[in-house]
Amino acid sequence: MPRPKPRSPRRRGRPPPAAPPPPPARPRARRYRPGQRALREIRRYQSSTALLLRRQPFARVVREICLLFTRGVDYRWQAMALLALQEAAEAFLVHLLEDAYLCSLHARRVTLYPKDLQLARRLRGLQGEGF
C-alpha cells in the first residue's frame, strides 16, 4: 500500500480570536469565628451616640398613638419635640434591656428570654401590658 504524500496544513484565513481572559476570581469572604461579628457590633453601638431608631418610622408611631388618645384630633409635632421623645424612648429601652440582661445572668443564662423582660418591668414597677 503506498504511503500518502505529506501535505502542508490548510490555511483558513484568520485564526479565531482568542477567548477573553476569565474575570479575576473574587477573593473568598473572610470567615469570622462565631460571635466575633456580634462583639464588633456591640462595641460599635456602645461607642456611638447616634439614634438607633429611624426618625420617620418613630414619628409615625408617635402620631398614631397621639391619634388614639386624642379621639382623632391630629396634633402637630415640632421636630425638636419628636427628637426629645425619641431620645427618652431609646434611653428607656436600653436601660430596660440592660436590666433584663442582668436578670438572665442572675438565672445563669446568656440568652435573653421574654420572662427576663417581664421580671425587669415588674421590678421597676412598670404596669400595663397594652402599650
From Swiss-Prot:
Subcellular localization, as worded in the UniProt entry:
Nucleus; Chromosome, Centromere
Q: Which GO terms describe its cellular component?
A: CENP-A containing nucleosome; condensed chromosome, centromeric region; nucleoplasm
Residues of the region (Disordered) are 1-33
Q: Where is this region: H3-like?
A: 34-131
Gene Ontology biological process terms in this record: CENP-A containing chromatin assembly; establishment of mitotic spindle orientation; kinetochore assembly; mitotic cytokinesis; protein localization to chromosome, centromeric region
Comp. bias (Pro residues):
15-26
Spell out the Basic residues composition-biased ranges.
1-14
Keywords linked to the UniProt accession: Centromere, Chromosome, DNA-binding, Nucleosome core, Nucleus
One function term, GO molecular function aspect: structural constituent of chromatin
Q: What is its main location?
A: nucleus
Asked if the Swiss-Prot or TrEMBL record annotates the protein with the keyword Acetylation, the reply is: no
Q: What does this protein do?
A: Histone H3-like nucleosomal protein that is specifically found in centromeric nucleosomes. Replaces conventional H3 in the nucleosome core of centromeric chromatin that serves as an assembly site for the inner kinetochore. The presence of CENPA subtly modifies the nucleosome structure and the way DNA is wrapped around the nucleosome and gives rise to protruding DNA ends that are less well-ordered and rigid compared to nucleosomes containing histone H3. May serve as an epigenetic mark that propagates centromere identity through replication and cell division.
The entry describes its oligomerization and partners as: Component of centromeric nucleosomes, where DNA is wrapped around a histone octamer core. The octamer contains two molecules each of H2A, H2B, CENPA and H4 assembled in one CENPA-H4 heterotetramer and two H2A-H2B heterodimers. CENPA modulates the DNA-binding characteristics of nucleosomes so that protruding DNA ends have higher flexibility than in nucleosomes containing conventional histone H3.
Q: What is this protein called?
A: Histone H3-like centromeric protein A
